[in-house]
């Protein structure tokens, strides 16, 4: 990977080999960032590109001219950006370059392939959003399943969420977000699959700022999608949501009409459509529509209905229900992670271009029934206590859906392993053991608070200078804007 140079340090003059999409993305980010790299020339064996400019950088000729061009341009480092090249082609290019004695980087990391060690099974799985509620759980399961894992995440609340996993020899961590093309390119190098969990999650968080939601849930997904396609990474797993079904009186499945009632759901549908349209010979996406998640994770959340009810019952002795008749499909966070691994392990032709609802038919429940269940479990486990339930059925929550999970069960043999009572008891035990350092209502455990922190950064001048966003070009905002 690239060695970062401090801001203000003299820029290193870089010659880029390759003029395709991957190299173009990298050149754009080099020019935009303060990493200390200055692309001054490009080599490509396509004669029609000779003399053309890419982001203002000239294509000087074929790769065999590397010695002559490097000398003429005072090159200090060479970057090979041809992910589609064969091993023989790369070996020839590397041979030209190594004779110069200059530092040489290859995008993606094909070094292991040239050494005969780059088997598919040991190439990393990239988890975008690997520091989140689901991501931290998934990373642990992948590592335990002998995968090499690379995490790409903003870590808004700090990298402590990974805990002892950071010391695992098969884990690599890159801190940043998808719209930083330089860091994204590093994160994608030599990946065998990409699991996209990042973005603003949930209706409340996504309703804070429309531009913010569109950037992180739509624009950033497009950037990631185009980069994955350019690098010919075959497997792409996208985390969608059963909230795309909105309000429905019928039990819905993957073929049912979508009825979004929030910007969050609309953003998921937009990304689903774009991803599936991009499927092809070298790109095999899978869409996973998650049920509402519950359970303990390294990156805890108490803005999820089951976790919130459990914390209220345990700490306050009462549960407040805002609308009791709506149906929700539920699934434990560890089962979500297991479903992703199940897709990753499946033959690619079995999951390519497929949409799966992820949950279990036995875990469809109304909010009112859930509150009663939580109260009963916590009441029973806390001897001598009584949990009260307050219901406000005047609350207008248009989300109401029961979901069929027959397809994922029949296709991949997936069923939830952890039931509601066990998950509730797990959360209550963690609360009793003092696992969570702050009260359940602390902003640390809420995606709304995380979104507010990201919003401040999003509108800053520094973010605009180092991240790609079509939206930011059109927004006329003060650089020191703060959250209202």
Language-model-detected regions and their locations in the chain:
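N-terminal Rossmann/SDR dinucleotide-binding element
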Residues: 120-193
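Conserved Rossmann-fold NAD(P)-dependent oxidoreductase catalytic core, especially the SDR/UDP-sugar
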Residues: 196, 222-263
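Conserved beta-loop-beta element that borders a ligand/cofactor-binding pocket
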Residues: 241, 272-297, 307
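Active-site Tyr-X1-5-Lys
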Residues: 247, 259-286, 314-315
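C-terminal substrate-binding subdomain of Rossmann-fold SDR/epimerase-dehydratase oxidoreductases
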Residues: 321-484
């Amino acid at each position: 990977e690239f060695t970062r140079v401090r801001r203000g340090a003299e820029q290193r003059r870089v010659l880029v080999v390759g003029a395709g999409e991957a190299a173009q993305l990298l050149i754009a980010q080099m020019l935009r960032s303060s990493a200390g790299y200055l692309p001054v020339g490009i080599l490509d064996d396509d004669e029609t590109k000779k003399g053309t400019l890419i982001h203002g950088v000239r294509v000087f000729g074929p790769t065999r001219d590397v010695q002559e061009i490097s000398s003429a341009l005072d090159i200090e480092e060479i970057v090979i950006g041809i992910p589609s090249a064969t091993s023989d082609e790369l070996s020839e290019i590397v041979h030209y370059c190594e004779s110069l004695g200059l530092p040489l980087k290859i995008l993606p990391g094909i070094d292991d392939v040239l050494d005969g060690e780059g088997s598919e099974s040991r190439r990393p799985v990239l988890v975008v959003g690997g520091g989140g509620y689901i991501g931290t759980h998934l990373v642990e399961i992948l590592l335990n399943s002998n995968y090499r894992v690379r995490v790409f995440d903003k870590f808004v609340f700090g990298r402590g969420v990974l805990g002892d996993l950071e010391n695992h020899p098969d884990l690599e961590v890159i801190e940043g977000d998808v719209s930083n093309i330089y860091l994204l390119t590093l994160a994608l190098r030599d990946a065998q699959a990409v699991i996209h969990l990042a973005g603003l999650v949930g209706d409340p968080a996504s309703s804070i700022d429309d531009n913010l939601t569109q950037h992180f849930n739509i624009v950033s997904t497009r950037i990631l999608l185009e980069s994955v396609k350019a690098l010919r990474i075959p497997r792409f797993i996208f985390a969608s949501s059963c909230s795309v079904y909105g309000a429905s009186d019928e039990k819905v499945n993957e073929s049912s009409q979508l009825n979004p009632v929030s910007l969050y759901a609309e953003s998921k549908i937009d990304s689903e459509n774009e991803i599936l349209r991009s499927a092809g010979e070298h790109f095999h996406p899978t869409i996973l529509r998650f049920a509402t998640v519950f359970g303990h994770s390294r990156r805890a959340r108490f803005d999820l209905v089951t976790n919130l009810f459990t914390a209220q019952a345990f700490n306050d002795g009462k549960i407040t229900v805002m609308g009791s008749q709506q149906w929700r499909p539920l699934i434990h966070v560890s089962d979500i992670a297991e479903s992703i691994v199940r897709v990753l392990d499946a033959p690619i032709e079995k999951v390519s271009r497929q949409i799966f609802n992820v949950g279990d038919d036995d875990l469809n429940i109304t909010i009112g029934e859930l509150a009663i269940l939580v109260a009963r479990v916590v009441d029973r486990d806390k001897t001598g206590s009584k949990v009260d339930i307050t219901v406000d059925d005047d609350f207008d929550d248009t989300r109401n859906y029961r979901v069929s999970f027959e397809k994922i069960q029949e296709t991949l043999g997936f069923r939830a392993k952890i039931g509601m009572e066990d998950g509730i008891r797990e959360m209550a035990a963690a609360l009793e053991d003092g696992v969570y350092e702050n009260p359940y209502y602390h902003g640390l455990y809420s995606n709304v608070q995380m979104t507010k922190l990201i919003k401040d950064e999003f509108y800053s001048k520094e973010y605009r200078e180092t991240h790609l966003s079509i939206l930011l070009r059109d927004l006329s905002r003060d650089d020191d804007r703060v959250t209202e």
